[in-house]
Amino acid sequence: FGHGGLLAISILYFVLFIIVGNFFWKKDKKTPGGLLYVCAVSVIPLLVWAFECLVGIMPKELDTYNDFHIFIRQGWIMMELATISVGCIFLKYRKFPLLTLPICYSGWYLSMDIVPLCLGQAIEPTWGMRNFATVVFALLMLGYALKLDNKKQGTEDYSHWLYIFGATMLWGVIISILAQFELDNEFAYFLTAIINLAYMFISILLKRKIFMVW
């Protein structure tokens, strides 16, 4: 199809997801409608990537969309910012908590892609930089989830999904750090047990079962 074809298909999917999503939403079928809105926001990275490739903005080494989920590159930043922006617009007009999924996911990617730019280095981040960015982003997400939890109004529970994403990212980076240090098995198991106990304590303190999963 080429980049022009992918752009046209992405726009078509985006519009169809919105139209059908609106149909269900207005019929008071919030779940299918909301899921289609999530799909619409999830199309944004591909749409922006195809557009940037078509007009020649995207670097040639980023000419494969699948690399977006594999490699950390500064060239993805516009895709991530666009996804976050569109997701926030949807979230403002359609109160569906799962819309935080593409927003958080893109925010996580952005937190890693932007690190070299903040340091003034247009290079691929090291594992240490990636882990640091993930830890900071996960803690910020958990902190914001706690803030929303304390100010919870209505039936929508946005903090629930933020807790899930934040706890998952934090657990993943902890495992990554332990693997890098190549710690002795018994010591690594001990640290893992301590972290699990901390998660259990937080779960009891916040009355959130999600932390018990880990």
Predicted feature residues:
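Alpha-helical multi-pass membrane segments and their bilayer interfacial helix-loop junctions
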Residues: 1-214
